[in-house]
Amino acid sequence: MGVYHGNDLKKPTGGKKRPHQKVKRKYWMGRYPTFTRLDNRDVRVHIRVRGGNYKIRLKRAAYANVIDPETNTARKVRILRVVETPANPHYARANIIVKGTIIETELGKAVVTSRPGQDGVINAVLIEKRSERPAG
C-alpha cells in the first residue's frame, strides 16, 4: 500500500465547500520510511522508483565509511552502537540510524552524513576519537 504525499484536495477556508475536482495522482505516492537498524551484517534492498530507476535502501547496517578530518582519510569500520539521534530520541533506543545520528565506531564517535534509507550506505565524519586504554 502506498503512502499519500499530496494535499487534502479541499479548500481549507473561504466559501462553500464543494466536492473536490482533483483526483489523486500516482506521482503523489510515497513509501514508508526504511528505519535502518544496527545489525551484525549489511542488508540492502533494491527498489524500483519513478522513471524506472532503482534506489538502494539499507535495511540493516554493520559498517560505516568514516572520514577522519584530521588525516583526511576514510576507513570502513564496524558500528558498535547508536549513541544519540537528534531527529527522534526513540530512534537511539531502537538502534535506528538516520542522517545526523551519532554512532560509536571502532575509531570513535561519528556523525552520519548520508541518508541510509535513500543512499544504501552509511557515510560518517569522526567527531571524537576513541581514547586508547593503557595496557596493564
From Swiss-Prot:
Region listing for Disordered, in residue ranges: 1-23
Organism listed in the record: Hyperthermus butylicus (strain DSM 5456 / JCM 9403 / PLM1-5)
Any GO molecular function: structural constituent of ribosome
Protein family according to the UniProt entry: Belongs to the eukaryotic ribosomal protein eS8 family.
GO cellular component, one term: ribosome
UniProt cross-references to NCBIfam families, sorted A to Z: eS8
Keywords per UniProt: Ribonucleoprotein, Ribosomal protein
Assembly with partners or alone: Part of the 30S ribosomal subunit.
Protein name listed in UniProt: Small ribosomal subunit protein eS8
Lineage: Archaea, Thermoproteota, Thermoprotei, Desulfurococcales, Pyrodictiaceae
